[in-house]
Amino acid sequence: VLGFVVHELAHKYVAIKRGFFAEFMFDTRWALISLLTTFLPFKLLATGYVAIIGNVGPRDSGKIAAAGPTTNILISLVSLSAFRALSSFYGYSIVNTFLLTVAYVNAYLALFNMLPIPPLDGSKVLGWSMKNWAYLFIASVILLILSVYI
């Protein structure tokens, strides 16, 4: 939940910084889909989205879209780094398990959102910059692998 909230707040923050009005919109369809995935091996947490009001071109749209996955990548990276630092002192503890879970969930959120399928963030980032899309996609894949096999 933390990763989802920070992800959406990042979209809103960047949109406002770029001069647009942004508001979180609750979407009952996505909330229902999220609820249904609790019974599946993979989870989807998407109860809404940030609606951006204004004339948003591909560059602005891509930068706003990149903010969410970038935040998830940073949270995953910080959590993995903290896990590595603490595990060398304390071994496997509940704190380390929590940090590894946070790293995994945020890497998963970043990777899922970077899929180049509309309406996901990846399609907007790719429409703006293939290079930036590749950086974010590869970073999320690497972090997901590290969080599983560390």
Show where each model-derived region lies.
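Hydrophobic transmembrane alpha-helices and their immediate loop junctions
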Residues: 1-150
